[in-house]
Amino acid sequence: VRVFSEPRFDAKVDLDAHLRLVPKDARCKGMFFTHLFKLAEPRMAPERLLELASVSERRFLPFHDYAMADHMRLLHATAGVTHPSSPRGEALRRIGQTIYDGILGSHAGKVLFGVLGLDTAQILAIGPKAFKLMTTNWGEVVSERIDDRTFHVHYRSMPAFLETYHVGTVEGVLAKCGVRGRVRIHVRDLANA
């Protein structure tokens, strides 16, 4: 029996524990890095943000693959920069809430999601398939429609701030579509929910 509960946005977020579980060859697209630079830019230049995150400076191209561990370091640092007075989990959630708009702003996002308009059910159904195009060789996301108003999104082998950032991504989709909803989570461990 799965018990779903409210996400704990005020709980400590252990970056190192997450990073220990990320496969060394796990990759994601450069668009996720550049999205973080845009969010942090009013407060911090990209070069300084990379330094803060201990990520080597280089050019990030939207459709090239980069180390997922570097993205997670940058995401964690960006959360502290963009929402300095919030608990880190809440800050990660807020960044997650922006990612769907960020994806829609890309060419790939327009191709994948543009035709769906504001159809929440279609977006939640297509989202996991898009995940495989935007990350490589790690993790699995599966969306399961339970009824007209309920979806279960399963994350497997994906230690990527599931209770904070990824809850925020679903909240961001709901907000974009003008749907009032509640996101609850069943956390099995850092990589599975």
Labelled PLM ranges:
Residues 58-165, 187:
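Amphipathic interaction/junction segments at domain boundaries or subunit interfaces
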Residues 2-108:
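N-terminal low-complexity or simple alpha-helical regulatory segments
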Residues 2-4, 9-15, 19, 23, ...:
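Short terminal or interdomain "cap/linker" segment that borders an active site or interface and mediates
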